[in-house]
Amino acid sequence: MRDFMDYIQLAFYDASKWNRDNSYSQLTTTANALLDFSTPERLKVNLSSLSTPHFATTYTLGTVGLIDGSISYLFTTIPLHDTPSRSTLIPLRKLVPGYRQIYPPSLPPAFPAADGRDGDLAIGGTEGDLKKKATLLHATLHLPPPTTLTGSFLRRLSPTTQLSLAFCSSRAPASKSAPQATLVTQILYDTGKYNSEFLFSTDNALFGFKGLWNFGPDPRKQNQNGGDPAREPCRSLLSLLSAGGEVYYSPVSSVVGLSTGLRFTTLPAATENPHSTFPYTLTLTLTPLTGSMSTTYSLLASPNLAFSSRFGFNVYSWESEMVAGCELWRRSKKLHTLQRNSSPLFAVDDLTWARRKMGLQDAAVSVHPERDGLPGIQRDDHDMHHHPQRPHASDSVIKVRVDQSWNIRALWEGRVKELVVSAGIALGPKSRSSLSYASSLAASGPGAAGGLSSYGWKSVGVSVLYSS
């Protein structure tokens, strides 16, 4: 489950009209959400609030033998009026990453002014409004010692350029020396057709570059056909192929890093046709220096069911990795009835998906699925901005993943009254150091099954979120 501050930061990206999917860093987002999710390892309580449209706070308290916590503050120059902040109104799919639908590349529109007006109005506004560019400040203090302070600064320099600063400072207990700090600077440039990121870190003077190229029509040239490239993307495209890579170099430690990857995904236009396939995403990533290769396949089998798998292989060590996972969303009967009795935008029942595939007409299906967002697909859809007070249709989700070593993780996330609860368990082989002397004697006794005693619980935890 995302932290409340991460949820607010994603809302800032949406309000500033920045496409976070068009980045090499997000190449395997769907597979990571379905396969690499984490489970709580202790009891954790989060109290959050969006007290004003510009200011948010979060207080976290956790216990695992020792009590620790954190305090977070966030400020944005863009008012987040349409962002639900109450834990009973936040769409659960906004807090739980899952299958994310990629949309056709489009030219970034003019960003809104700090007073929340549209980009066109901001361009025609005063010079003072133009100088108030979208900015976000975020800081978190982790207590008790070792005290760690983390923070970030985001600023939209232009419709195609964004500046990102992140720092981390920590001080060991009883240390009289100055706290150690690391600063990471990123400049992101997005044209819709391609995206580039330039990075510098003060840790070993690390330099980096990331790039992503989308094959197909250039959204910057769509205006030659009389359309608006910012508001009329290539909706006729059925699929999208993207290629990218990243390279790092540190002159201090002489460290070099290199990776490249491909992503093929279906677009919303491919699911509008009754004879089309289900939404799916394929990725291939290579790390030549270490000899690692990884492929993923993710499929949205229904609006509430998604599968994903990953196979990794190293050509030097001949080691392999196989991981499979799935997520299943559940809708309560009360919310399901409310959904069917509401407007056609929300009237999507369990058979809509099948009717669309069979070519049958269904009045409940929206005529603009690429605008409203398909149900079950991660998208900043219409109902979040225009119906923020409606309960979300999906109120709980179950995630399960397993690898070739039988490491199993299971996660349940849903609402209990006014709380968002996340409960998870992790099972798998235990290391020899974690086995007690008594269990070792039991395993060596008569009738002991070889290796079975080393398999068991790894962690169990619950995380609770309340926001206002």
UniProtKB/Swiss-Prot annotation:
Function recorded in the entry: Component of the ERMES/MDM complex, which serves as a molecular tether to connect the endoplasmic reticulum and mitochondria. Components of this complex are involved in the control of mitochondrial shape and protein biogenesis and may function in phospholipid exchange. MDM10 is involved in the late assembly steps of the general translocase of the mitochondrial outer membrane (TOM complex). Functions in the TOM40-specific route of the assembly of outer membrane beta-barrel proteins, including the association of TOM40 with the receptor TOM22 and small TOM proteins.
InterPro entries: Mdm10
Domain comment as written in the entry: Lacks alpha-helical transmembrane segments, suggesting that it resides in the membrane via beta-sheet conformations similar to those predicted for other outer membrane proteins and porin.
Superkingdom as given in the UniProt entry: Eukaryota
Subunit structure, interactors included: Component of the ER-mitochondria encounter structure (ERMES) or MDM complex, composed of MMM1, MDM10, MDM12 and MDM34. Associates with the mitochondrial outer membrane sorting assembly machinery SAM(core) complex.
Compositionally biased intervals (Basic and acidic residues): 370-386
Region (Disordered): 370-394
Subcellular localization(s) per the UniProt record: Mitochondrion outer membrane
Gene designation: MDM10
Protein name: Mitochondrial distribution and morphology protein 10
Annotated GO biological process: establishment of mitochondrion localization; mitochondrial genome maintenance; mitochondrial outer membrane translocase complex assembly; mitochondrion-endoplasmic reticulum membrane tethering; phospholipid transport; protein insertion into mitochondrial outer membrane
UniProt key word Transferase: no
Record keywords: Membrane, Mitochondrion, Mitochondrion outer membrane, Transmembrane, Transmembrane beta strand
GO (cellular component) term, any one: ERMES complex
Family per record: Belongs to the MDM10 family.
Topology relative to the membrane: Multi-pass membrane protein
